[in-house]
């Protein structure tokens, strides 16, 4: 446990950022999973879910939660399987 006031504040800030990042990453994973399920089941709203998943992947990539190449790979897989 840090003793210096600024270090204590930094720990608190880091915990908040970590919680926010984990939440956003989990939301992205859920969106991708829902899109893949819709594609496999040939659901009516699969295009809508794929667009939402791509949007969430792009946001995660911009926030440096995932590497840009991984984001491109996920988007490519979604687009190719949705056709």
From Swiss-Prot:
GO terms for cellular component: cytosol; small ribosomal subunit. One of its GO terms (biological process) is translation. One of its GO terms (molecular function) is structural constituent of ribosome. The keyword Signal does not apply. PANTHER family: 30S RIBOSOMAL PROTEIN S20, SMALL RIBOSOMAL SUBUNIT PROTEIN BS20C. Belongs to the bacterial ribosomal protein bS20 family. Binds directly to 16S ribosomal RNA. This is Small ribosomal subunit protein bS20. It comes from Staphylococcus haemolyticus (strain JCSC1435).
